[in-house]
């Protein structure tokens, strides 16, 4: 009898399991995300994507759920996220999808709260992230061609995309998961034109994700057609205040029945070391989202919550070298530490109008904010305690040559007698300090384009030591192939000639916590209040309760911080960021450890303090960077105007074609009149064309002169590869306005390409312009 009952029970359970399986399969089959006429379709019904861009590595895992709930309460129905290759494969072939890298867990949390997910798996992501998400170890292959059909690069991309799909493809909507769209590459039009490469990435993703996922590619309105693939959804990226109709005009011509989506609507902007904190008006952002939704256009708000580029993950911008700060606050609706801003509350009011029901309540912060008294860091160890591998070479070796991704390299060599003044020249990536027999004699800072310094007369046998700290690798444009350390030779020039050292000792100094701990194992006690030497510093503080806080680093110089083993990120006394966000989930009751690696040494003693508020807008520059030196202005009456022209009003690119190609190094524009009759002038982007009508590379362009610059709207914004940023004069500055750009060398120029600001009406756009090409022969 028992046997009969046992079999009946098993049969009943089996039938029940089959019934449940069929139900799940039927439910899964009914879930789809597709493209309809003028709209996206979710399960066959019109669906407007209202996405919040958030990045899981920039948020402590303990706070993921809070940030997701904040996005939900804002009125968003989707999360948009990059998958960062270099955080998952920090060493070739060694993948990590655990802990704060568990992107699948992040997506499951989104689904738990009723949100869909858009996945952007690169391989390149930009995001003001180290090397745009590409792993540094790719550069160990010197001839590699990044973001092209280089065999080795494509093999590694294929492996990465396979591993990502293993984690995330089971979470696609076809399987009942939250993932509705997957992006192919990222803004490739701003990098180049290579449809075969973009097609190859698409094919990889199609192979890994199947044909039931919607693939799309994003670009700018000015370049999306260069790499547009016929079987992909096309989306546009643009920023606060942009003329939305103009941004989608070309797409509407080519695909009148396609759904419209702004895949990156930039809520603010990122900060760079040595420049003012960036902000964008709340009203302009909110009005833009309102207009977008009123027209049934989908969007992803980049960023809704920026978070923090912890550790060494902050990138750098180009042309030139402009390293990003640790904070990725982005002036977003949800600030760096998870609190709603005025942008949040204003946007929430608008989003409520487009919601099906009442929005969820805004969740409380997961922790209170705390502060502490000043903390003295009394333990000290010299930089040499952290030395790693050493190699001898006939040339300076880069980080990549030494198999080091991040940190500092120390180069030493012995000099012969060099009488008189000595000019040392080198291309150091990124911040180099120079010593003669242990005495500091100067520095070069790549962010200031410094490549040389003068040395005193050198005696025979003098030791030359160069300490080079690497900052974030460039994350945007062609300069992403960014080696660290000394790139090329070091030369020393005297009246008697040029000498190039050929006997170098190169020593690594990694910037990880393990190295810091090793260094401090042989520490000494110092007077923290008077400390000034480069090296490692450690101190402790006790807490009776934990909470979020901000570690004030103003007393220190330049380097990295670790609290209880967690890498908070880079600090630099020049600002604008002076505090580092310290999540309360990384603290504990009782004793907490602070370790500081300072490569230049404290400025005001070895001390820190936990504050209950951030300081991210305080500059401490030796001298302000200005470009209105009269010595750099146009020589009066000595130059011939190449062209006087009248520009058209309105948004969009215009070509200014010279009467004949001219050769020169400098491009000067003299603006005599603006379209609106006012004196304030603005330019979003400028390009030059060579004699064949091709765009001239701008990587070496620099500002020579600008008669006026308003705040962060400096002239370099006119050639920073970003169409949403711009040069703008002060409102009180009078016409005519003059700008001069140094292209780096003499070359033939046949035309200029000019882009006014993207906002409706193109505010500050020029009307009457004189063009001059001169110098460099």
Feature locations, PLM:
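Aromatic-lined ligand-binding clefts that engage carbohydrates, nucleic acids, or primary amines
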Residues: 421-435, 464, 541-564, 571-572, ...
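Short beta-strand-plus-loop segments that form exposed binding edges in beta-rich domains
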Residues: 466-472, 596-602, 670-677
């Amino acid at each position: 009898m028992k046997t009969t009952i046992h079999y009946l029970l098993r049969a009943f359970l089996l039938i029940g399991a089959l019934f449940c399986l069929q139900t799940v399969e039927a439910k899964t089959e009914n879930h789809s995300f597709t493209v309809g006429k003028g709209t996206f379709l979710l399960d066959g019904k019109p669906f407007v994507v209202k996405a919040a861009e958030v990045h899981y590595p920039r948020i402590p895992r303990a706070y993921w759920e809070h940030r997701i709930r904040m996005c939900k309460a804002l009125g968003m129905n989707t999360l948009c996220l990059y998958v960062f290759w270099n955080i998952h494969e920090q060493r070739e072939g060694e993948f990590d999808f655990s802990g704060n890298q568990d992107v699948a867990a992040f997506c499951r949390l989104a689904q738990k709260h009723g949100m869909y997910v858009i996945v952007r798996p690169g391989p390149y992501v930009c995001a003001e992230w180290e090397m745009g998400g590409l792993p540094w170890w790719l550069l160990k292959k010197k001839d590699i061609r990044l973001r092209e059909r280089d065999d080795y690069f494509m093999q590694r991309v294929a492996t990465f995309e396979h591993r990502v799909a293993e984690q995330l493809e089971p979470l696609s909507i076809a399987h009942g998961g939250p993932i509705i769209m997957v992006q192919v590459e990222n803004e490739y039009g701003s990098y180049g034109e290579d449809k075969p490469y973009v097609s190859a990435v698409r094919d990889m993703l199609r192979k890994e994700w199947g044909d039931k996922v919607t693939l799309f590619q994003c670009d700018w309105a000015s370049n999306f057609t260069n790499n547009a693939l016929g079987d992909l959804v096309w989306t546009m990226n643009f920023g606060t205040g942009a003329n939305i109709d103009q941004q989608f005009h070309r797409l509407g011509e080519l695909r009148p029945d396609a759904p419209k989506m702004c895949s990156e609507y930039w809520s603010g902007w990122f900060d760079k070391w040595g420049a003012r904190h960036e902000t964008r008006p709340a009203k302009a952002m909110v009005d833009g989202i309102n207009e977008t939704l009123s027209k049934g256009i989908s969007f992803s708000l980049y960023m809704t919550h920026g978070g923090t580029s912890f550790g060494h993950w902050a990138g750098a911008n180009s042309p030139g070298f402009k390293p990003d700060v640790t904070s990725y606050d982005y002036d977003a609706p949800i600030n760096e530490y998870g609190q709603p801003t005025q942008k949040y509350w204003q946007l929430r009011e608008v989003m409520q109008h487009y919601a099906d029901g009442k929005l969820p309540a805004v969740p409380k912060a997961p922790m209170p904010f705390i502060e502490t008294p000043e903390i003295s860091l009394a333990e000290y160890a010299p930089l040499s305690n952290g030395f790693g591998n050493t190699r001898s070479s006939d040339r300076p070796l880069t980080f990549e040559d030494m198999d080091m991704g991040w940190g500092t390299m120390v180069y030493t060599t012995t000099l012969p007698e060099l009488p008189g003044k000595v000019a040392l020249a080198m291309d150091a990536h990124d911040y180099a300090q120079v010593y003669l027999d242990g005495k500091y004699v100067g520095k070069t800072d790549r962010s200031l384009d410094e490549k040389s310094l003068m040395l005193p007369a050198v005696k025979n046998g003098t030791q030359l030591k160069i300490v080079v700290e690497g900052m974030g690798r460039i994350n945007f444009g062609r300069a992403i192939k960014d080696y660290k350390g000394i790139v090329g030779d070091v030369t020393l020039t005297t009246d008697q000639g040029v000498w190039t050292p050929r006997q170098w000792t190169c020593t690594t100094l990694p910037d990880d916590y393990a190295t810091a701990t090793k260094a401090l194992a042989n520490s000494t006690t110092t007077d923290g209040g008077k400390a000034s030497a480069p090296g490692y510093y450690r101190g402790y503080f006790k807490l009776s309760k934990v909470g979020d806080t901000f570690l004030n680093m103003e007393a220190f110089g330049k380097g990295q911080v670790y609290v209880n083993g967690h890498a908070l990120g880079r600090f630099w006394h020049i600002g604008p960021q002076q505090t580092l966000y310290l999540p309360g989930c990384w603290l504990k009751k009782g004793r907490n450890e602070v370790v500081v690696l300072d490569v230049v040494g404290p400025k005001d003693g070895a001390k820190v303090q936990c504050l209950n508020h951030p300081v991210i807008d305080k500059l401490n520059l030796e001298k302000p960077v200005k470009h209105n030196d009269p010595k750099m202005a146009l020589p009066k009456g000595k130059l011939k105007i190449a062209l006087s022209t009248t520009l058209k009003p309105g948004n969009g690119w215009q070509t200014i074609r010279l009467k004949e190609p001219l050769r020169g190094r400098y491009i000067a524009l003299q603006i005599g009149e603006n379209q609106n009759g006012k004196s304030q002038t603005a330019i979003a982007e400028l390009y030059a064309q060579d004699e064949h009508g091709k765009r001239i590379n701008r990587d070496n362009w620099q500002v020579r002169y600008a008669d006026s610059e308003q705040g962060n709207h400096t002239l370099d914004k006119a050639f920073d590869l970003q169409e949403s940023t711009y040069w703008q004069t002060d409102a009180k500055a009078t016409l005519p306005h003059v700008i001069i750009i140094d292209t780096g060398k003499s070359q033939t120029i046949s035309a200029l390409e000019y882009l006014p600001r993207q906002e409706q009406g193109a505010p500050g756009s020029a009307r009457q312009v004189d063009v001059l090409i001169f110098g460099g022969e």
